[in-house]
Swiss-Prot record:
Regulation of activity: Present in an inactive conformation in the absence of bound ligand. Ligand binding leads to dimerization and activation by sequential autophosphorylation on tyrosine residues.
Keywords assigned: ATP-binding, Cell membrane, Cytoplasm, Cytoplasmic vesicle, Disulfide bond, Glycoprotein, Heparin-binding, Immunoglobulin domain, Kinase, Membrane, Nucleotide-binding, Nucleus, Phosphoprotein, Receptor, Repeat, Signal, Transferase, Transmembrane, Transmembrane helix, Tyrosine-protein kinase, Ubl conjugation
Protein family per UniProt: Belongs to the protein kinase superfamily. Tyr protein kinase family. Fibroblast growth factor receptor subfamily.
Polar residues: compositionally biased ranges: 782-792
Organism: Mus musculus
Intrachain S-S bonds: C55-C101, C178-C230, C277-C341
Cell compartment(s), UniProt: Cell membrane; Nucleus; Cytoplasm, Cytosol; Cytoplasmic vesicle
Protein name: Fibroblast growth factor receptor 1
Amino acid sequence: MWGWKCLLFWAVLVTATLCTARPAPTLPEQAQPWGVPVEVESLLVHPGDLLQLRCRLRDDVQSINWLRDGVQLVESNRTRITGEEVEVRDSIPADSGLYACVTSSPSGSDTTYFSVNVSDALPSSEDDDDDDDSSSEEKETDNTKPNRRPVAPYWTSPEKMEKKLHAVPAAKTVKFKCPSSGTPNPTLRWLKNGKEFKPDHRIGGYKVRYATWSIIMDSVVPSDKGNYTCIVENEYGSINHTYQLDVVERSPHRPILQAGLPANKTVALGSNVEFMCKVYSDPQPHIQWLKHIEVNGSKIGPDNLPYVQILKTAGVNTTDKEMEVLHLRNVSFEDAGEYTCLAGNSIGLSHHSAWLTVLEALEERPAVMTSPLYLEIIIYCTGAFLISCMLGSVIIYKMKSGTKKSDFHSQMAVHKLAKSIPLRRQVTVSADSSASMNSGVLLVRPSRLSSSGTPMLAGVSEYELPEDPRWELPRDRLVLGKPLGEGCFGQVVLAEAIGLDKDKPNRVTKVAVKMLKSDATEKDLSDLISEMEMMKMIGKHKNIINLLGACTQDGPLYVIVEYASKGNLREYLQARRPPGLEYCYNPSHNPEEQLSSKDLVSCAYQVARGMEYLASKKCIHRDLAARNVLVTEDNVMKIADFGLARDIHHIDYYKKTTNGRLPVKWMAPEALFDRIYTHQSDVWSFGVLLWEIFTLGGSPYPGVPVEELFKLLKEGHRMDKPSNCTNELYMMMRDCWHAVPSQRPTFKQLVEDLDRIVALTSNQEYLDLSIPLDQYSPSFPDTRSSTCSSGEDSVFSHEPLPEEPCLPRHPTQLANSGLKRR
């Protein structure tokens, strides 16, 4: 009889707990039995920390039950329940709530409550405003207390200062604390490597929070390495403490997946399942979740490749944290099987797989524990059953994984996995592949294609590439024409493609074809394949050069892309400069058409739209400039070369490129000095591209030698406003050139601002020819011969052209070189 009363009491208590409101993790008054005050222990946990809860137990406890917000708490890969204790690893804000530990015993039941708040604030990047306020109040209180005895400075929280060596990746925020006290209140100052540390000693400066005795440095770079010493002193003494900072420089690599994740799962029918996949990547990764499925009763196709279904893929508004977790609700027997986490970036692809086993749900029968022996029997039987299931799952997984191929292709909702080509070295299987990547075949197989009649490229053996039916175009439907130029890996020729549109098989389309040069190497082949695979992954957009097809079989590799008839944006702008201007190298030249202000803003708007799309696909361009934007017959701007696997820092800064311009003039300071490439560094380059547009193809930083440019950028100098540029657009350029990357606008914000400016700009606002021209940067600076060249800036100019006269240099250009101090 007493047992039934206990059970009834427990049911009433659980029902009351279920009524608890989620937004406020507090216990309602009606949940407090018989008016007895209920104690709730409050816990504040930072994201990523270990959450530990321990229940108070009586000696005669027979059962323990854990609830969160009135719902039964179950174990997962992060949550471990061991009787009276609960541990949650890598806590996240979703773990916040009201936890309850309900214990039953012959003498009654007891409940312990924990109110858990997992703060969204990261301790390394936030300003701890609450701490500042409270500390300030304490300081004021300390100062106002009368008759306080003098005390030399001392540490108030020495346990928080035990970690002296801090190794962090570049671009992270670093915060050092020296919490201390004394009477009178001591002062705080910071040294770097034993010398006084001032904000202007680093790009972006730093913040000192005197209320919390801390220093904060945003977006750290390798030059921030060193020893940082805090000195706390008053008239009665001085103490100091030194932290060592090591900034780890990021290097490009394909995504790295944490070993053991995702982990195999064995759950009951109707349960919820969570797969976790930790991805580490410097170039931002594109993550997908796949499930291996059966098609017509078979998991393997005729070509011995498995079928998969895409369950989750990254969108414009999804974050990497959201993509790292796959949730399955109310699982059924059909959900059992193999699941794969696939991550890719501009360097390559990686994947891990795990198995889900679904078991028949066990009926829950209410029973009263009559003896501890009965409870032990249930525990032993349950443990033996679970161990057997786990062993069975491991055996099945080993048998299945031995027959799987590791080549993945994931662009259709349900499709066969095509052979994925690594984006660096194709001819060997990577030795660092994970255990779940049992690749046993060469992804690019050596073969002799003697039937093709094509001469073998120097330094490159011939290879058989896997055919992709969605992109493959027969060679007899491609007619090659005149050369258009030379690219990074080879040459580009004009061609006519027949039947690119499957619905119109006889339509002829003008296209551009990228191919290798005769002296190409294996690395050139690797890079061209890398660019093709990246274009497939990124997809299509109006303002980027889109992939149309490829010829990979029975001959050399041809990559077919859209053709832009009006050349690159820089040449397009120069050809449309108003006649009679001093900086025009041919004053008698009549432009093809005159551009209005609205036309120029439209150019910028279209490029921003293309970059916004690339950013949404986690693609970092690294070399955005007017020369890499192409113009179609309909004046549509298309961003090119976004799929190149380039390493800009292998370029000699003192060597001219083919068009006489160096990438350094478009590179952000963090990319130039510390090799950190992000979407924010692309925004800096976009600001330089804006300057090119409104100078009608001018050369950035005219007359400035490389060594001087480095110095001026570090000192905060920026280029002047072009004459035909509004103040609003110039401020947009300056925002793009902010020294702190996080303070620059995003491409989404730039698109919104330029869209508004386009709508407000009149079609009749042509360039004002009466404005003085000394602020324009000449397209061809005066470096054409020994009689009018400057040795300092010859690295920034064009090679001499026979029909171009030597232009006089403007005095104002020599005076300030078109630069302002920010």
